[in-house]
Amino acid sequence: MGEMEREGATAKVGAGKVGAGKVGAAKAGAAPAAAQGAGTKVVAAQGAGTKVVAAQGAGAKAAAVGVGKVGAGAKAVGGTIWSGKGLALGLGMGLGAWGPLILGVVGAGAVYAYMKSRDIEAAQSDEEVELRDALS
């Protein structure tokens, strides 16, 4: 039940994660261990089922790099503003591009309320001074 990351693709090896069932679990679990022991490269392709490919040589490394680039490209497209992963505050609230806008509106409202309360306090203070002067 291990998890490996190679070249931007993730291979999950386990009884419930291989193909459509448990049939290839033992073979899939043994393939990465045998492949790494021999100094070969393990590449995983994400699709309907997880495929583990043990490759060796320059051509296989080039193929592995190609798989990594496809995974990175898909990740870059998936992380846009509209999915909530691009332009965001990182608050974990799922606001996406709306987060900075909402924060700006709340900030502007707070500044407006503060300035308004200062004006009201100044007016009350002036009234109190006038009242004190009138009573004395």
Swiss-Prot record:
Keywords: Biomineralization, Iron, Magnetosome, Membrane, Metal-binding, Transmembrane, Transmembrane helix. It is a single-pass membrane protein. The chain crosses the membrane at residues 86-106. Signal peptide: none annotated. The keyword 4Fe-4S does not apply. May undergo cleavage. Residues 86-95 are annotated as: GL repeat. InterPro entries: Magnetite_Biomin-Domain (IPR053517). It is found in: Magnetosome membrane. Disruption phenotype: Normal magnetic response, slightly fewer, slightly smaller magnetosomes. A double mms6-mmsF deletion has an intermediate magnetic response, with slightly smaller and fewer magnetosomes than the single mutation. Deletion of the 4 gene operon (mms6, mmsF, mms36 and mms48) gives an intermediate magnetic response with fewer, smaller magnetosomes in irregular pseudo-chains. Deletion of approximately 80 kb of DNA, including this gene, leads to cells that are non-magnetic, lack internal membrane systems, grow poorly, have reduced mobility and take-up and accumulate iron poorly. Residues 107-136 are lumenal. Residues 1-85 are cytoplasmic. Induction: Low levels of protein are associated with magnetosomes as they start to develop, rises to a maximum as the magnetosomes mature and then decreases (at protein level). Part of the probable mms6 operon. One of its GO terms (molecular function) is metal ion binding. Residues 115-136 are annotated as: MIC, self-assembles, binds magnetite, Fe(2+) and Fe(3+). GO terms for cellular component: magnetosome lumen; magnetosome membrane. This bacteria makes up to 60 cubo-octahedral magnetosomes of about 45 nm in diameter which contain membrane-bound crystals of magnetite (Fe(3)O(4)). Promotes the formation of magnetite in Fe(2+)-rich conditions, when magnetite is not readily formed. Binds both Fe(2+) and Fe(3+). May help control the production of crystals with a specific morphology. May function with MamX, MamY amd MamZ in biomineralization. The 4 genes of this operon collectively influence magnetosome size and number. Full length protein oligomerizes and interacts with MamA. Belongs to the magnetosome Mms6 family. NCBIfam families: Mms6. The C-terminal 21 residues (later called magnetite-interacting component, MIC, residues 112-133) self assemble into multimers up to octamers; this fragment binds Fe(3+) which alters its structure. Also binds Fe(2+). This is Magnetite biomineralization protein Mms6. It comes from Magnetospirillum gryphiswaldense (strain DSM 6361 / JCM 21280 / NBRC 15271 / MSR-1).
